């Protein structure tokens, strides 16, 4: 059992350390080259995550190879902390991406201690002020609407993502006529005033409907969809960390066994 625990800890942490080092190297490379607007959103979280992954994995390798009681204890402490953080993150993501659960828990509490506004958290933090300006620049830089060429007249029949449907074309209720996928005009028979999102629409490729409320709704739906996937990823990570924690406990329990007997 001891040999299996050591082998599992060494193999898994070696792989994770390489992944962390590769991610850290990529982050530094992007920083040196000058990140785009989209890359700025993930650069700092990626650097921190990669550095922590490399650090904890290195601790695991040292703990399994040399059996230092202090290092093993420190390694287990960080693993336990990681489990707690992943659980909290998963619950938080569930609350902010599930309107029913978010609404049920928003503003609850005892006395002056109240929970936050989970129902509108994503909208309040991403769809306002400088954060939204950064997102619109990211959408423009990433050319999310460029998959449709000027001659692509079959625009409506394509499978559009929430972001593309809300940001790359005027709202359906505007009644605009499409000359092609990148150019829309007001019909000559239009009788209603051009207001709201219809007025915000621009045929300029760096503007389009990025200033529309429909674009914010599309981005909000896109964030919720991807964050729900992140919950599944977090749960898989929790299982992996629990496995490593169990193996680490076994290594710690038997760390007085002579070094050679751990592998032979």
UniProtKB/Swiss-Prot annotation:
Q: In this UniProt entry, which residues form the Cytoplasmic topological domain(s)?
A: 1-13, 67-75, 250-264
Per the UniProt topology annotation, the Extracellular ranges are 35-45, 97-228
- Glycosylated residues, per the record, are 180
Which BP terms in the Gene Ontology apply to this protein? auxin-activated signaling pathway
Record flagged with keyword Glycoprotein: yes
* A GO cellular component entry from the record: membrane
Q: Which locations, inside or outside the cell, does it occupy? A: Membrane
Q: How does it sit in the membrane?
A: Multi-pass membrane protein
Q: Where are the transmembrane segments?
A: 14-34, 46-66, 76-96, 229-249
Going by the UniProt record, its keywords in alphabetical order are:
Glycoprotein, Membrane, Transmembrane, Transmembrane helix
Pfam families associated with the record = Tetraspanin
Protein family per UniProt? Belongs to the tetraspanin (TM4SF) family.
Q: What job does this protein perform?
A: May be involved in the regulation of cell differentiation.
This chain belongs to which protein, by name? Tetraspanin-12
Q: Please tell me the species this chain comes from.
A: Arabidopsis thaliana (Mouse-ear cress)
Primary gene name? TET12
